Amino acid sequence: VEVLDGNSVIASDTVQTAGRAEIRTTLFIEDPILWSPEQPHLYEVRLTLLNRATGELDEATSYAGLREVSVTDGQLCLNGDPLYLRGVLDQGYFPQGWYTATTDEALRHDVELTLAMGFNCARKHQKAEDPRYLYWADKLGLMVWAERPSGRVFSTELIESLTTEWMELIKRDRANPSIIAWVPFNESWGVWHQSERPEQRAFVDAVTSLTKALDDSRVVVGNDGWEYSSGDLWTLHLYNDC
């Protein structure tokens, strides 16, 4: 395993194994360049599979961004500095494909357009966003609040499907440095009566805790905009007649 900054290998490790195995290793990077909207620095990660007798068998490359999201004294922080969000609620529609972009360039254009309008964050509302969108957010420096489509009627089936799909989404996307917040629930959709029904409130709290257990490297907004029972941030959605 090698971590590269440009053409230079800045960290590496070799792990011996046999047969099918899950490998974990920890690499130390001295004085890392932290990812931020102003400097969305990414490191290349290279994994090479070697056979002691025949040499290289396979190689895969990816990338990683290093950053810290925290809440300090009631203030959302990125890399230890107070963070002021200029965010847009983005439902990810495309004229040709509704929720599906027809090209990778269309996804990149969405990120570039958001940044060009002066925003530094997008809340991907009611959509598990395309991984290529997240790639461009990582690369171009757009922070993301990641959400999922909500259920409508509270039931055992909702609990099972939502929990399974949410876990899959977190495990798929948690390596993206651009994601600074997980939003498992929006405005009590699917849990409309959590203030009166303990089982609904317990479900919200359980999913919030599950999210933190799967990934504690960013904040969790348990129920965005409506009743608060758990999570790192308390958010309000205020609607005014125009």
Question: Positions of the model-derived regions?
Answer:
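Secreted/periplasmic carbohydrate-active enzymes, especially glycoside hydrolases
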Residues: 1-124, 128-131, 136, 140-144, ...
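Substrate-binding/catalytic cleft of secreted carbohydrate-active enzymes
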Residues: 109-112, 121-242
